[in-house]
Amino acid sequence: MSIIKITDLNLLNKKVLIRSDLNVPIKNNKISSYARIHASLPTIKFALKNLAKVIVTSHLGRPTEGIYKKKFSLFPVFKYFKKILPETNIYFSQNLTECSSIKSGELIILENVRFNQGEKENSKILSKKYATLCDIFVMDAFGAIHRNEASTNGIIKYAKLACSGLLLESELKTLNSALTNPVRPMVAIVGGAKVSTKFKTLTTLAKISDTLIVGGGIANTFISIDHNIGKSLHDPKFIEQAKILKEKYNIFIPTDSRVSTTFTYDSIATIKSTSDIHANEEIMDFGDISIKNMINIIKKAKTILWNGPIGVFEFKNFSKGTEQLSKAIASSDAFSIAGGGDTLSVVEMFKVQNNISYLSTGGGSFLKFLEGNKFRIIELLEKHFNKFKNNNF
């Protein structure tokens, strides 16, 4: 994979448009997690330090294209940038035409790209508009690398020069190394609700890991191969595929569970063998024996790849499995990678973010990468490498 890195380029006085992933959770105009902002900062700071004219853009949420809605605005993100970069002149722009007067060492945060008509359909007209804003386009949004949209894909086709940012470079390098040359034993943990959305991921990780631990609705699907699981969330269409994986690979499936007859925050948890679930009961977390056995597996690991909670961690009586999992990974000497879906929320909830070796910012892109998918955006960046190699920029 040959891609120009931002560190390869002379940025002095150049207009540099950085496509970041600033898709942070915002409620009542307040940001509840700053993880993606802080992950994007090194690239932005690097460009500012090298006296580029820096323009940053991102998506946030899923607004109706072409229609402004305050709850999807990046304005709270802009305000946070003002707070953490107090010595930098930072501006907020809702208009692509307002970027012409920017000076070296200054920063403009553009409004949510998904307010722009043509963003999601990868409009040629919009892509060209983005490209005219800059001398150099920097793709740094690993979390959007699987989305072929105007601000991620189309712009690369028309930009004078396109490169990777520090975050994208780090994500690709770390994940590629973990998947192709892991230090063994390698343990993968995949939780979440549905097998259907993660079946390719499960198959890939079952093949390359020494042990695959399954949790959540995914584990319930595996349990249902041999046992009645009552009214537990599972994916009946994938039972046969799950059976094939179970027979072929080393998959850890819980043997006891925390169950309840109701699904509320205050539901009472009862620990039962997975072979003794009643019709009116629902599996909501690992039982203590399964937690202990899972921790013993994690203790022996040298590489850990974690995606998703293994229980209904939002409910206090069903958070133990996910909490103990996160703490076991955090206290392990193994190289650990966590990412995708609710994983970052779990990491922050149980305050283990400083003890995970690498936190991936990707959601769907994290899973797509684990599945071994090829990304069109990477192919487009590689074309710019060939252009750069043959011409001094």
UniProtKB/Swiss-Prot annotation:
For this chain, the annotated S-S bridges are none
EC class (word): transferase
Q: What is its main location?
A: cytoplasm
Which keywords accompany this UniProt record?
Answer: ATP-binding, Cytoplasm, Glycolysis, Kinase, Nucleotide-binding, Transferase
HAMAP family according to UniProt: Phosphoglyc_kinase (MF_00145)
- State the oligomer form and interacting partners: Monomer.
Describe the family membership recorded for this protein in Swiss-Prot or TrEMBL. Belongs to the phosphoglycerate kinase family.
Q: What is this protein called in UniProt?
A: Phosphoglycerate kinase
Annotated organism of origin:
Buchnera aphidicola subsp. Baizongia pistaciae (strain Bp)
